[in-house]
Amino acid sequence: MSFAQQKLSELAVSIPGATKIFREYDLDFCCGGSVLLEVAAQQKNLNLAEIEKRLTDLQQSKAENNDKDWTSASYAEMIDHIITRFHNRHREQLPELITLAEKVENIHGDRDDCPIGVVAQLEKIYAELSQHLMKEEQILFPMIKMGNYAMASMPIRVMEMEHDEAGQDVEVIKSLTNNCTPPADACFSWKALYSGINEFIDDLMHHIHLENNILFPRVLNEK
């Protein structure tokens, strides 16, 4: 089957490193991962052949492939990785981004291109994500580690819905920040804010990908 006829989520799982390519093209491989690559490219007027070539090159060369194959890792190892690499990182990222955003809004609020509203949106994401991470760490992940797979089914569905909501919140951030593209004369804080938001989005998308496309399906398929 050609890459064009595969879902974004399937490609993100089968080709480690593909997530980086998808982010470059602003292709949603986590919350919108059920869309075929061909359809997603058409929706955004992207060059499908170019994307397929990059995926082929990545698959063949394994260049930049430092991603572990989580499809066969133990649940405990995967969960510990998610908490250490993503949960803890998000808790560090968001307060700093809020501080930077407040500075930019306070100093440049009179400019037409100032991202007014990004502080409130980041605070919303921080509040909701903090609750989400806590529920995973205190309820869902212990269930999975203890092998209570049937009980984990409903919490997983709730987490997936919250992932969708987080994806929608990210789209609002992109809209407010011109897809995280600072103006040519942006100050250091403005540039640092957008760079930090981009990093946060990269991390969040990969975080959701690991759960939605690998961890959760594995648990739901347990007999």
UniProtKB/Swiss-Prot annotation:
Record flagged with keyword Mitochondrion: no
Source organism superkingdom: Bacteria
InterPro entries given in the database record: Hemerythrin-like, RIC_family
A GO molecular-function annotation: nitrite reductase activity
Record organism: Haemophilus influenzae (strain ATCC 51907 / DSM 11121 / KW20 / Rd)
Keywords: Cytoplasm, Iron, Metal-binding
Listed name of the protein: Probable iron-sulfur cluster repair protein HI_1677
Family named by the database record: Belongs to the RIC family.
Cellular compartment(s): Cytoplasm
Role noted for this protein: Di-iron-containing protein involved in the repair of iron-sulfur clusters.
Main location: cytoplasm
One GO cellular component, as annotated: cytosol
Example GO BP: protein repair
